[in-house]
Design a protein with these regions (language model features):
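Conserved class I S-adenosyl-L-methionine
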Residues: 1-52, 65, 69, 93, 151-189, ...
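Class I SAM-dependent methyltransferase SAM/SAH-binding core
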Residues: 57-59, 63-111
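A conserved beta-strand element that flanks and buttresses the S-adenosyl-L-methionine
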Residues: 124
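A short glycine-rich, Lys/Arg-flanked "PGG" loop and its adjoining helix->strand segment in the class I
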Residues: 136-151
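Acceptor-substrate binding/catalytic loop of class I
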Residues: 156, 160-164, 195-210
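Short alpha-helix
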Residues: 191, 202-225
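C-terminal lobe and adjacent flexible extensions of AdoMet/dcAdoMet transferase-like proteins
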Residues: 214-263
Length: 263
């Protein structure tokens, strides 16, 4: 049985990791990022049309770089994160970028308690829903907070990425040896379990078909699905991500789904 993902564990993990994460990870405010070492919105063009005055909610915002990018385009942004230390970095970036957004300290599972009277034109989350126990339930709740025709963007860990990269995995009939990704079970990928700084966290991947079904069950029409290859210059990168040795050219790290409220 899969380990239960606990909100308290995730909070402690990100509070402890925050300063190191924001130091070694370079996330630009000059592009909307979808995941590590992959193209941003300037190349992928996945977001619904944006107009000044629209409202947006970011779940699991970290330092809120995506919300700041949207705010520069006239979008009225609310950004929410479970980690107070991540939000402290967001406040510092707000001052640096001279852009105002509303920051909320709350777990994704309780976002609705802080947005009771609000509705949004866009709700987005980049690599955060893999850290919650029931992402399907979150998607259903997200749909109820959209304005008619509103959009949803979720990027998350790709199920193939939670396999193991093995050197010399395959030998062909000519004796040539190839590296590759080994995954024991695509339909139930192994968890990415993290034990750092005395804290514990779990990142969980799901099949692409599961995410597609969850969008549909929430009343969302899937308008785009992407599994981008790595690029050399990415809006979200680090030395480790950049030095992937070609693995991310062959196995996607990020799954992106964009949907629209059908009601």
């Amino acid at each position: 049985m899969a380990e239960r993902i606990k909100t308290g564990d995730e909070c402690a993990y990100w509070d402890a990791l925050s300063s190191e994460y924001q130091t070694i990870t370079r996330i630009s405010c000059g592009d909307f990022h979808y995941g590590p070492q992959i193209p941003g919105e300037s190349r992928l063009h996945l977001l619904p049309p944006l107009k000044a005055g629209m409202t947006a909610l970011e779940l699991g915002c970290g330092a809120a770089q995506n919300s700041l990018w949207l705010a520069k385009r006239g979008i009225r942004c609310t950004a929410m994160d479970i980690s107070k230390n991540q939000l402290a970095h967001a406040k510092a970036l707000m001052r640096r970028e001279a852009v105002a957004i509303d920051l909320v300290h709350a777990p994704i599972e309780r976002f609705h308690l802080f947005c009771r009277e609000k509705r949004f034109d866009l709700i987005h989350s980049s690599h955060a829903l893999e850290f919650v126990q029931h992402p399907d339930r979150i998607l259903k709740r997200i749909a109820t907070f959209l304005n008619p025709g509103g959009g949803v963007m979720v990027s998350t860990v790709h199920p193939l990425y939670n396999g193991s990269w093995i050197t010399g995995l395959i030998e062909d009939e000519d004796g040539a040896v190839y590296d590759g990704q080994f995954l024991t079970d695509y339909f139930s990928p192994p968890d990415d379990v993290r034990d750092d700084n005395g804290c514990h966290a779990v990142s969980r991947a799901y099949p692409v078909s599961a995410w597609f079904a969850w969008f549909r069950a929430a009343g969302l029409e899937v308008t785009a699905l992407a599994e981008p290859k790595a690029v050399r210059k990415a809006p979200y990168t680090s030395d480790d991500w950049a030095d992937h040795g070609g693995q991310l050219d062959r196995v996607p790290s990020t799954l992106i789904l964009v949907g629209r409220c059908m009601n």
